[in-house]
A protein has these predicted regions:
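Alpha-helical substrate-recognition element adjacent to the catalytic core
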Residues: 1-77
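C-terminal cap/substrate-recognition subdomain and adjoining C-terminal extension
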Residues: 51-152
């Protein structure tokens, strides 16, 4: 699965243009998603030196993004005349999501288990939270036809 991840307010507390403190478990969760063979794209308003600072901050903590602010690393206006920063991702993780940003443990469960908000709410009310094996349909070989924000 291709997952676009915002930086300020999502991976770190929002202190733009400075880099805020890491949000609890953000880099650990991102590394788990990479290990699960998801392709992560850094999706941020940062450009130039500020973007490089964010990429380096993540790299120093073991998080290597597939690309930053583009669909693939080599994409430019030279080789793609229709280049746009609007990404073609399967999922977006962003603090500006409707309902706000869940904690990173919840994010991992939603991605790896294919959970939707309504499932998590039902589990919370019933007390039967599923921490089982990740869903095989959520891995990188999943069809890339369905693009969405967090499903409700």
């Amino acid at each position: 699965m291709i997952i676009a991840v915002d930086f300020d307010g999502t991976i770190v507390e929002n202190r733009y243009p400075e880099i805020g403190e890491e949000r609890p478990f953000a880099t650990e969760t991102l590394k788990m998603l990479i290990k699960d063979r998801h392709r992560l794209v850094l999706w941020t308003c940062r450009e130039g030196e500020l973007l490089e600072a964010a990429i380096n901050w993540c790299r120093e903590r073991g998080v290597e993004f597939y690309a930053a602010n583009r669909d693939y690393p080599e994409e430019t206006t030279d080789n793609n005349p229709h280049f746009t920063r609007k990404l073609k991702a399967d999922l977006f993780i962003d603090d500006r999501n409707i309902g706000g940003l869940p904690d990173w443990g919840t994010i991992y469960r939603m991605v790896s288990h294919g959970k939707k908000w309504r499932h998590l709410i039902d589990e919370a009310y019933s007390g039967s939270i599923d921490y089982g094996e990740p869903s095989s349909s959520s891995h990188s070989h999943r069809s890339h036809h369905h693009k969405s924000w967090w499903p409700f």
